[in-house]
Amino acid sequence: LRNQRNAQVVLGEVTHIDLANRTVDAVLLGHTYRTPFDSLIVAAGAGQSYFGNDQFAEWAPGMKTIDDALELRGRILGAFEQAERSSDPMRREKLLTFVVVGGGPTGVEMAGQIAELAHHTLIGAFRHIDTTKARVILIEGADTLLPPMGAKLGGKAQDRLEKLGVEIQLGAMVTDVDRNGLTVKYKDGSVKRIESATKVWS
């Protein structure tokens, strides 16, 4: 936009839009600024959709902002650290089970990155746990990964992820999420509980 002489980029929090007078009020560092406009495009950004289950957000954060990414990074690395300190095999297993919900581009990338971290990057970083034993599970409601991009590309993504050690569950819908894991319902009507300390909603 900097090459557009008639465009202006302004930092601030919009507090009021006056359509009749074609002005926008924004606050920055405690000061309100009024900016006139000829054309106004409102792009508030993307939010996470939990499909009417917003209570899932506490235990399965999304990844739409830098703050979200930092929170997830802390949860993922923290799970390895807690597993290292735990002497309870069941607790370790739960801590080393990472579930990514959603097989779109973000979920595919996230599952691949967690698998890469666990199965390659962190090898030898801990004394009491084998990070290569970490489970990374990717859950998708459709019959293929990357549904909007077609079955061929989805199949290629699935092959790559499986080579990284990602367990892929297709035709699966998450029906509940809590501190200790999540509940998944499959197309055949079966229901399964997955114990996991770290869940990511993508």
What are these regions (language model features)?
Residues R2, F80, A118, L122:
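Conserved hydrophobic residues forming the short capping helix/wall of the S-adenosyl-L-methionine
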Residues A7-V99, G189, V200:
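FAD-binding core/adjacent interface of flavoenzyme oxidoreductases
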Residues G12-I17, A115-S202:
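A Rossmann-like FAD-binding core segment of flavoenzymes
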Residues A111:
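Glycine-rich loop/hinge motif
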